[in-house]
Amino acid sequence: MAMEMTLQSKWLGATWGTLGDSITAAGGYQPLVQSALGFSEVFNYAVSGCPMTAGGDRDYGATTHVGQSIAADLDCVTILAGVNDFRLDKPLGELGKADVYTFYGAYTTLIEHILKKNPRCRLSLWTPLQRDKDGYDIFYVNAAGHRLVDYADAVAAIGRQYALPVLNLYELSGLNRLTLPHFTSDGLHPNEAGHRRIADLAIPFLAGL
């Protein structure tokens, strides 16, 4: 009970907004984290099947666009993106260039918008999980010349640039080619056990911010 109260003390009654793709849109890990940390409300802005990066036929749901219209008074905002950018061959671009048609540019444009609009919010970046679906695994090189780890590394680099905490699910989740059948329904989308694993990492991560 004492540990539960300690975990809840920081976020008890706070609001949390989640941005991302289908993994976040599923709403699987959020209730677990909310219960443990005491968030009063969770707003799920994720759009299934869409990347961070603008352009293409999924531009409508690009996280860089969707994030422009989130509530301006959220206490906590988390972004879990990158796996669809890998799958859809989005170029990384360069850190420091505000081109929303590249992963770096789209991500940093979103971050700057959120922090200018709501500088008091605690914003954190979560790397993509590993995957093994439809031939797209951690070894596959996409048409832009990148592996999935390159997008995960880009998230970490962006976090360093903006002094934002990064939850490295790519490295720490334990989801890999051997365990994906247990934690996902198809090598990509977490099942109940997968969402529990994400929550188990997210709870102490957010509690420590």
Short names for language-model regions:
Residues 76, 121-123:
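Residue-level recognition of the N-termini of beta-strands and the immediately preceding loop/turn
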Residues 128-209:
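Catalytic His-Asp segment of secreted/periplasmic serine-dependent ester chemistry enzymes
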